[in-house]
């Protein structure tokens, strides 16, 4: 993703979208080259904490005890960047971003623009039918 200079962008990932990346540490390292702040946002705080610890990610923000909508709103208010970009998967992610003043970018588009590899699981199991296949 070729964004503005690093002092102008806050980049947030929805946890499910971030799990789609094949090499999460490389995504964070690359994003830091052109973003001032990089972090994860999701409603399930325990899942975020576990994922961050498992992958030893060094992030600037996490959702805390807030839901996704409130986290987006508060992070936007506290970060002094011109641009706030939220990478997500669902229509709910898009709605949350747009209603809190963030730009929404689908994970596939972000990966393509930035050259970030997605897991095979992401492409094979995207959408409703993919989730059904996961059950069996």
Regions found by a protein language model. Give the residues of each.
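Short hydrophobic/aromatic-enriched beta-strand-loop microsegments
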Residues: 58-64, 104-108
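Substrate-recognition/cap helix-loop segment adjacent to the acidic, metal-dependent catalytic center
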Residues: 27-38, 43-62
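Asp-based, Mg2+/Mn2+-dependent phosphohydrolase catalytic module
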Residues: 1-36, 53, 69-83, 90-136
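Short beta-alpha junction loops
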Residues: 42-47, 88-91, 111
